[in-house]
Amino acid sequence: MASVTSYPLLEQIDSPERLRRLPESDLETLAEELRDFLLHSVARSGGHLAAGLGTIELTIALHYIFATPEDRLVWDVGHQAYPHKVLTGRRERLGTIRQAGGLAPFPSRHESPYDTFGVGHSSTSISAALGMAIAANEKGEKRKTVAIIGDGGMTAGMAYEALDHAGALGADLLVILNDNEMSISPNVGAISSYLTRLLSGRVYSTVREGSKKVLERMPPPMWELARRTEEHVKGMVAPGTLFEEMGFNYFGPIDGHDLSSLIRTLRNLHKLTGPRLLHIVTCKGKGYTLAEENPVTYHGVTPFDPKVGIQQGPQKPSSAMSYTQVFSQWLCDMAAQDGLLVGITPAMREGSGLVKFSECFPERYFDVAIAEQHSVTLAAGMACDGLKPVVAIYSTFLQRAYDQLIHDVALQNLPVLFAIDRAGVVGPDGPTHAGSFDLTYLRCIPNLVVMAPADENECRQMLYTGFLLNQPAAVRYPRGKGPGVAVEASMTALPLGKAELKRKGRGIAILAFGATVAPALEAAEKLDATVVNMRFVKPLDEDLVLEMAMNHELLVTVEDNVIAGGAGSAVSECLAYHGVSVPLLLHGLPDNFLEHGSREALLEQCHLNAEGILQRVKTYRARLPKSKASVVSSAAGTHG
């Protein structure tokens, strides 16, 4: 893909309204400019690349035909929405995407009126778009609603729940299925494209509906014969029978990179009403050969030179492993020792560190696609009959399977191990991917053991500990590297519910959980404070908590979780239950959603780095009543 040095057409487009003034003959050139701009902008700043390169033509066609923002476009997940951001007045800021104060990584209602629904998690678009279509109907508004969902998003049950409901209602809704995993041969594509233009035309639609009314008055066998004949003709070239059974008129598949075909078809579909589904076939990374050949590598990228691509050479030596790498190595080591171990992930093979496991133990590796609920109940079923399941999942995605976690695993006290990645502060992917809540929603569940490692080696030992337990267990760990502690090859089970005294001090005791232990130790040097690595959020080491309360003037809990219901709350509840009064400062994440930015910047913003912890403790201690015990919650400037 040759680089374009200037973008004369693209630079004219500051809104979709301006786009719609262009003659249709200019749109191919605009697509070339937009694709080149997107490639070089993301290559400079980092971000999601391959998906956006694959939706250039679709995005142009949608904004060209539909009167956005009055007509509603709802993007699923949002990885593919970078071209949408560019065409809706955010071109000059695209280089700031995922950075503190910059553009949000996904569509956000707070950022633009063209972002009609905030996304980040998969398979929500059809439900949200259906809600908007119903609202338009209830209010007597004539606007159109379009949901754009990828084939990956269609692996989740929620998408089919919404399709079934929309079809039953007969809602005026267009769903565009962006299929970037399959290809169609030129012959099938040509026939299918012709059929789609025919079926989406107003003449066919009028005849079809008129024929329905006539046939409905005739004997049922004749109606059924006509329906099956239509299905047979369409089924020869289109895999749309499932959608038709749900009440949708199905069109496609068509080439999602053929702008003229897209515009012609969308223009026809715009004139129609009722549930419609357009199936388009696209190529992830379209126009950039390296991304086309390896879309996984170019899905989310750090800055790189587009002339040479992402270099996959040997990594620079580092004293610190990432927590994901620690999990990956432990899983393979444990699987080699225990033939009953099985690994499960909901479409996060690379992100959760299961690539090596899937290659070494393919028969014991289960990627259930974007189906978090299924992944947890699948693990429960496996555990019932003697397998030892390990579910590798992001903190934010485990939220989607909360009922299954309670009802199917914990209630039956089944030995399922949850390896929870991206816990706490995550960073550039913003509030939709932050792991701010897991300690709160996990520690209230009976039978579940909850652990948070302070370093890489402890993570390995906690995973081993949880695996050996004959009950549900969760190990939650942050994104990125640990403090640099060497990981032992051996595995040793930790004493259940026992904390570790890391530093003896005077006056102040800091009870730190997980990744906050390292900065707490650094802050303690200037405070001469005692530091405890709590290790277990549940069961809590109540004996050590009470000992710290008896021997110190002030207790401080530190966690990378929201304070409400978190680890600090567990300490507070323990003290209250035992009737112990001691000044207690709860320090953690604030009571708001964390915006995007680097993990380091967000930790500083939340005062969870060493300096932030130090200042929080000093500020609180300075105003602490000498004769009165109190409990204070401290979260990035919010006390209460």
Curated annotation (Swiss-Prot):
This is 1-deoxy-D-xylulose-5-phosphate synthase. Keywords: Isoprene biosynthesis, Magnesium, Metal-binding, Thiamine biosynthesis, Thiamine pyrophosphate, Transferase. The lineage of its organism: Bacteria, Pseudomonadati, Pseudomonadota, Gammaproteobacteria, Chromatiales. GO terms for cellular component: cytosol. HAMAP family: DXP_synth (MF_00315). Its EC number is 2.2.1.7. It comes from the Bacteria. SUPFAM superfamilies: Thiamin diphosphate-binding fold (THDP-binding), TK C-terminal domain-like. GO terms for biological process: 1-deoxy-D-xylulose 5-phosphate biosynthetic process; isopentenyl diphosphate biosynthetic process, methylerythritol 4-phosphate pathway; terpenoid biosynthetic process; thiamine biosynthetic process. Catalyzes the acyloin condensation reaction between C atoms 2 and 3 of pyruvate and glyceraldehyde 3-phosphate to yield 1-deoxy-D-xylulose-5-phosphate (DXP). Pathway: Metabolic intermediate biosynthesis; 1-deoxy-D-xylulose 5-phosphate biosynthesis; 1-deoxy-D-xylulose 5-phosphate from D-glyceraldehyde 3-phosphate and pyruvate: step 1/1. The gene is dxs. It holds the Pfam family DXP_synthase_N. Thiamine diphosphate binds at residues 79, 120-122, 152-153, 180, 288, 372. Its cofactor is Mg(2+); thiamine diphosphate. Belongs to the transketolase family. DXPS subfamily. Mg(2+) binds at residues 151, 180. Homodimer. GO terms for molecular function: 1-deoxy-D-xylulose-5-phosphate synthase activity; magnesium ion binding; thiamine pyrophosphate binding.
